Amino acid sequence: ADVAMTPMGEHVGSGLTKSKNLLLLVAVCFIMGVLITVAEPDLTVLASQVAGIIDSTVLIFTVGIGVGLFLVIAILKIVFKKSLASILMFFYMVMFALSALVIINGNIGFLPMAYDSGGVTTGPITVPFIMALGVGIAATIGGRDAEENSFGLVALCSIGPILAVILLGIDASGTLDYQIPDYAIADHFLAATLHLLVHTAKEVLLALGLIVVFFAVLQVTVLK
């Protein structure tokens, strides 16, 4: 993270802010928010656990869009120097109201998974990038409270996936059939381990590849 995602976040944040193009800043932050979330290993694990009630791809991109939208809100908070407490209070009230609606509809078992999805924003890829992005934007904008203004981005982004998954849960049907994984050593340990490594490597390379390609295009077209 220190070698890749943190410098990338600072570079993107400062470069886009210097362009003075708010629409471009919002669009890029949304896309990067989606891509870094999709690349999170934690999200893949969560999606596999609830595949019986929600399609894994739908859940992954729903959470990604939630993070992307709230990353945009967090960035706009920095740009317009709005109160973090007021924004958090408003969206928490919305979140609890939607949670009550899920309970009324009889899908209370859906809520733990929805709130657990917020943990994706504490992953090893997402956190360094979001924090560095905020620091880069706040430092470029400047001002007496630049450091304080960049505070709270991860807290805001954690709301996005929770709200997104709760919205999925309002009309969801079925039951969560979670089974504890079998951690016993298989007879063909080497073959099983190799298969798992190859499968995981493919997922990680695909997700990180999207980030690399998007950053390369951004570097050539906007940040040059």
PLM region descriptions:
Residues L22-S99:
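Helix-loop-helix junctions within the multi-pass membrane cores of secondary transporters/permeases
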